[in-house]
Amino acid sequence: MTYSVSPSSLLTEYGNDNICRVLALDGGGAKGFYTLGVLKEIEAMLGCPLYKRFDLVFGTSTGAIIAALIALGYEVDQIHALYTEHVPRVMSSRSAAARTMALQDLAKEVFQDKTFEDVLMGIGIVATRWMTERPMIFKGNVVQAHGRKGTFSPGFGVSIADAVQASCSAYPFFERKVIVTAAGDKVELIDGGYCANNPTLFAIADATVALKKDHKDIRVINVGVGIYPEPKPGLLMRIAKKWLAVQLLQKTLEINTQSMDQLRDILFKDIPTIRISDTFERPEMATDLLEYNLDKLNTLRQRGRESFGAREAQLREFLI
C-alpha cells in the first residue's frame, strides 16, 4: 500500500509572532495512542496541521514515528489510522526478530524513500549508539547543528525509515539497527529511550543554542504516553523471563523520562512548558509498551483527549 499526505481541510493560518513553539514527544511503544489523543485535540484547537504551528518537533521511539509523520505534513487522524493498522501486527509478534521485521516493513511501507530533506519543519529523531553509549539525533536542517556544520548532512544521510526504526529498536525486544551514514560510517543503534525517553532537553538545546532563541520567546509542549498499572502476567508470562524483562524496560524508560523532566525544570524553569502525561490508577487501565489490543489502545487515545481538556486554556494561551 502507498501512503501519502491527503489535502488538508484544516485551513487556519497564523502570522509570525517570533515565538518558537516546540513539540516534544516521549517514547512508550504502543502507548503512543495516548499521545495521538492529546495531539488530535491540539490540532483541532489550532485548526491547522501541526507542522504549520510548531517550529520544532522532537520524538523518541513511538514519539519518533509521530514526529516524523507530523514533519512530513500528516494530520493526526492519518497517523492514527496508520497506528491502528500497523501497531497490533508489530507488537503481537512473538520474537525480537519477528517484531524487528514487522517494524522494518512498517517503516519502509509508510516512509518509503523519504529523507530528512523532505521535512517541513525542524525535527529531531533520538536514537542511542550501542557501542559508544551516546545519543545520535537525526536532524533535517544545518541550522540545528551544534558543530561540524561543514560536513552536516540532513539525517546523517540516512532515510527517515531507517532513523525511525533505529529510534524504536527497544532492545532486547527488537534487534539492534545498523545504519550507514553519508560519510560511510556504520553505526549500530538502539531505542532512543535508553538515553532520552523524554526528548525535551534536546529540543530546548536546539531552540536556545542552535537557533539562539531567548528563553522568553520559547513555548514547549511535551506530550508523554501516560502512566498505567502493570498488567497481571498470565501463567506463561510468569514462567518466561520476558515478563520481568518488560517490567525492567518499562521501569528504565519511566525513570529516564522523569529524570529528564526534573532536569528540565531545574535548568530551564524560565522557559514556559506544559507537560501532558497523566497517571491512571484504575486496574482496567493496566497496560505496557507491547500492548496490541485495539480496544485497550483506543481507551488510551480517549484518555489522551481528556488530558488535553484539563489543560486546554493554558494550551490555547501557548499556541494561539
Swiss-Prot record:
Motif (GXGXXG): 27-32
GO CC annotation, single: membrane
Motif, DGA/G: chain positions: 191-193
Keywords associated with the record: Antiviral defense, Hydrolase, Lipid degradation, Lipid metabolism
Pfam families attached to this UniProt entry: Patatin
Enzyme Commission number(s) from the entry: 3.1.1.32
Annotated catalytic residues: S61 (nucleophile), D191 (proton acceptor)
PNPLA domain segment(s): 23-204
Regulation: Phospholipase activity is specifically activated upon 3',3'-cUAMP binding. Is not activated by the other cyclic dinucleotides 3',3'-cGAMP, 3',3'-c-diAMP and 3',3'-c-diGMP. Therefore, is specifically activated by only the nucleotide synthesized from its adjacently encoded nucleotidyltransferase (CdnE).
Reaction catalysed by this enzyme: a 1,2-diacyl-sn-glycero-3-phosphocholine + H2O = a 2-acyl-sn-glycero-3-phosphocholine + a fatty acid + H(+)
Record GO biological process: defense response to virus; fatty acid metabolic process; lipid catabolic process
GO molecular function terms listed in the Swiss-Prot or TrEMBL record: phospholipase A1 activity
Motif GXSXG in this chain: 59-63
Note: This is a complex CBASS locus with the loci capE-cdnE-probable diadenylate cyclase-capV-dcnV1-cap2-cap3.
Similarity annotation: Belongs to the patatin family.
Role of this protein: Effector phospholipase of a CBASS antivirus system. CBASS (cyclic oligonucleotide-based antiphage signaling system) provides immunity against bacteriophage. The CD-NTase protein synthesizes cyclic nucleotides in response to infection; these serve as specific second messenger signals. The signals activate a diverse range of effectors, leading to bacterial cell death and thus abortive phage infection. A type II-A(UA) CBASS system. Phospholipase that is activated upon binding to the cyclic dinucleotide (CDN) second messenger 3',3'-cyclic UMP-AMP (3',3'-cUAMP).
Protein name stated in the entry: cUMP-AMP-activated phospholipase
